[in-house]
Amino acid sequence: MTHQFPSLSPEQKKELSDIAQRIVAPGKGILAADESTGTMGKRFQNINVENIEENRRCFRDILFSTDASIANCVGGIIFFHETLYQKSSNGKLFPQVVKEKGIVVGIKVDKGTAPLMGTDKETTTQGLDGLSERCAQYKKDGCDFAKWRCVLKISDGCPFALAIAENANVLARYASICQMNGLVPIVEPEILPDGDHDLQRCQYATEKVLAAVYKALSDHHVYLEGTLLKPNMVTPGHSCPKKFTPQEVAMATVTALRRTVPASVPGICFLSGGQSEEEASIHLNAINQVPLHRPWKLTFSYGRALQASALAAWQGKDANKAATQQVFVTRAKINGLASKGEYKPSGSADQASQQSLYTASYVY
């Protein structure tokens, strides 16, 4: 029996579906430029740049003002609240700069994590209060999609059933609110790479978490064709003594997704989870070469793995703008190829792109 309660109209569904498909068009992924002020401070510290608003604006201006060819491999950019209202050097609001290239504008809407009592330092994510009003305003201000990150971890007994259920429910509630306000929700249940667990343990946890997430999305009547998933790849823990090949990581990842993610989801945009730039690209490429049916687009939603070499090239100096943009475009193009399984590593990746970007208990 169909329910007679308020739900999305056919027009709303079509708009959401069209937005999601634009973001993950063939060869395209997402630039996650939604790092908080504190996280940007840590990045700037590494290159001895002061964490002030003008420097943050300056770096993001360099990324966003890259020539229009960037739109061939970047379909969407996730903004931080501050960035949404900043302007480029020539006086245009950043969302306008990005939209003129044909790139979809997104916004991070969660308010960070809070501890779950009675668990082993597990968390839920805050920010549901007032979310509908914020989403309505963001839609008016040019956003067409949103992102919300939940964090889970693998250790003895973790993730707890409570943490899985709570985070799945929070993600579903967020997704429902976004869709009612015309925003495509990116659903991000990240399992942190902290720990010494092996590939199989991560695959098992990933399957349990994703199964719970899609059950919750169904319970909340979320329109799956108008959503995107941003999961972790299935990788061994950062301290795992055993090494696994990109093909093993890819097979475990695709197997977990095939068991849990409905085919109606248009795209799965992986987070990089502290992998080096090159590693994140190689793994994405291998995932798109797995000899199994993959009904969704499998692409990237990278922050560190798209920006690390660019930051190193910039060093806070205006004179380095062209070099920074060149490094950024090169990395974005590599990931665009990887999202089609067409990246052929030359074996001569520079040192910056091979450096691990791992941070324990990573806070975005």
Curated annotation (Swiss-Prot):
One Pfam family in the UniProt entry = Glycolytic
Q: Which InterPro entries does the protein's record reference?
A: Aldolase_I_AS, Aldolase_TIM, FBA_I
Pathway(s) per entry: Carbohydrate degradation; glycolysis; D-glyceraldehyde 3-phosphate and glycerone phosphate from D-glucose: step 4/4
Example GO molecular function: fructose-bisphosphate aldolase activity
Where substrate binds, per the record, is at R56, K147
- What GO biological process terms are annotated to this protein in UniProt? glycolytic process
Q: What subcellular locations does the record give?
A: Cytoplasm, Cytoskeleton, Microtubule organizing center, Centrosome, Centriolar satellite
Q: What is its main location?
A: cytoplasm
Q: Does the keyword Aminoacyl-tRNA synthetase apply?
A: no
Q: Which UniProt keywords apply?
A: Cytoplasm, Cytoskeleton, Glycolysis, Lyase, Schiff base
Q: Cytoplasm: present as a keyword of the record?
A: yes
Name the Gene3D superfamilies for this protein: Aldolase class I (3.20.20.70)
The terms describing its cellular component in GO are: centriolar satellite; cytoplasm
EC number(s): the record gives 4.1.2.13
Which residues are listed under the site Necessary for preference for fructose 1,6-bisphosphate over fructose 1-phosphate?
Y364
Using the UniProt record, name the top-level EC class of this enzyme in a single word: lyase
Give the annotated active site: E188, K230
Which reactions appear under catalytic activity for this entry? Answer: beta-D-fructose 1,6-bisphosphate = D-glyceraldehyde 3-phosphate + dihydroxyacetone phosphate
State the family named in the UniProt similarity comment for this chain.
Belongs to the class I fructose-bisphosphate aldolase family.
Oligomeric form and interacting partners: Homotetramer.
Q: What is this protein called?
A: Fructose-bisphosphate aldolase B
Source organism: Sparus aurata (Gilthead sea bream)
